[in-house]
Amino acid sequence: MIGPERVFFDTAPFIYLIENHPEYYAPVSEYLAMCASREKIFLTSVITIAEFGVLPKRTGNLILLDNLTNMLRELNFQVVEINQDTAQLSSTLRARYTFLKGIDAFQLAAAIYTDCSEFYTNDKPLKNIQEIKVTVASK
């Protein structure tokens, strides 16, 4: 790959940061700082926004949505749309990896389609995906 490395962030790391998770806030924050110091490009997808928004809307804690929007903007995250090519890749991944859930397949497909070198998550089974390096948040 030519140019800076691209890292795709799954939904869980945003939840940990914005909600100050007692176990995962520090490691996710440190990982993000390390990536920033290496001038990596940050990406996520519209699926992250959809997944993240469920609990704040259910509980009425809409400030969390503002916090996500601000974080994405302040850290210059590129938010990837899902298109037909991504959908096709998603179905290919689900066909290959029978344990893969639909949402995870879309997130991974978005990362692969946008030439990310790494996928950052806390979903340990995703480490079995061969098409992209999967890094799991650790305590």
Residue positions per predicted region:
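Conserved glycosyltransferase catalytic-site signature
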Residues: 11, 46, 104-108
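Short, well-structured N-terminal submotif of metal-dependent ribonuclease cores
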Residues: 1-44, 57-66, 124, 139
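A generic structural signal for short hydrophobic patches within well-formed alpha-helices
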Residues: 14, 49, 87, 126-127
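Short acidic-hydrophobic, aromatic-tinged amphipathic segments that line or gate anion-handling sites
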Residues: 79-82, 134-139
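Active-site neighborhoods of divalent-metal-dependent phosphate/nucleic-acid chemistry enzymes
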Residues: 2, 77-120
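Short loop/helix-cap segments at secondary-structure boundaries that form the rim of catalytic
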Residues: 124-132
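Structured helix-beta-strand junction loops
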Residues: 37-39, 74-75, 96
